[in-house]
Amino acid sequence: MKQKSWDIHLEEMMEAGIHFGHQVRKWNPKMAPFIFTERKSVHIINLTQTARFLSEACDLAANAASRGKQFLIVGTKYQAADLVVSAASGARCHYINQKWLGGMLTNWSTIETRLQKFRNLEKEKLAGIFERLPKKEVADSERRLSRLRKYFGGIKYMTALPDIVIIIDQRKEFTAIRECITLGIPTICLVDTDCDPNVTDIPIPANDDARASIKWISNKLTLAICEGRLNSNANCMNS
């Protein structure tokens, strides 16, 4: 796919508060190239840099989607949890919006087995098998199913490791980033002024705390994924 602008406008980014970083005393010096200035002891992110890296991330996402690649969106902080579900659902991506369990990717064979058990339990419930079990077994099965839904609901149909992982908060999801690095899975990550931009493939300098900022950027990324998938379908129809 050809590169495009993705309708990234500085005014919209300012309205979403994407430029507000953390307090100066909390900064990571590696973020210096992405900081415009400081105001009232708070770093202000250079939105020109945000636009540049977000555009690059959208290009990557669209190209990958056009080739049938699979995405995993990770955001477990309370400000992001529901936004992650909405963004992932709209773009048909897998997601994790509760606790990241260690080994989610690096111990994939075990996770895959648990996902199969999850799918089987749901089939049994739908088939009415739970109704024929003793009360204690029903309670145990419901409890297991509830826990599986909480932690694995967003990856229930993920049958292989993702090709690209999109991460909302680098510091919060550092275990996920380490697993991606170990496995060589490319990452796109929002990086606030207290983050390390060098541990992700495409860092997007941005406020990773404000809901408006998270929503605006995740919408751009998932829009690019959707456009890539549409392009893939058009190519299939024309071939």
UniProtKB/Swiss-Prot annotation:
Pfam families cross-referenced by the UniProt entry: Ribosomal_S2
Q: Which cysteines are joined by disulfide bonds?
A: none
Where would you find this protein in the cell? Plastid
The protein's superkingdom reads: Eukaryota
Read off the InterPro entries from this record.
Ribosomal_uS2, Ribosomal_uS2_bac/mit/plastid, Ribosomal_uS2_CS, Ribosomal_uS2_flav_dom_sf
| UniProt-listed SUPFAM superfamilies | Ribosomal protein S2 (SSF52313)
Record's signal peptide:
none
Q: Which keywords annotate this record?
A: Plastid, Ribonucleoprotein, Ribosomal protein
Principal place where this protein is found? plastid
Which PROSITE patterns does the UniProt entry name for this protein?
Answer: RIBOSOMAL_S2_2
Annotated GO CC locations = mitochondrial small ribosomal subunit; plastid
Which BP terms from GO are recorded? translation
UniProt GO MF annotations? structural constituent of ribosome
Q: NCBIfam families from the xrefs?
A: rpsB_bact
Q: Do you know which HAMAP family this protein is assigned to?
A: Ribosomal_uS2_B (MF_00291_B)
Q: Which family does it belong to?
A: Belongs to the universal ribosomal protein uS2 family.
The entry's protein name is Small ribosomal subunit protein uS2c
Origin species: Aneura mirabilis
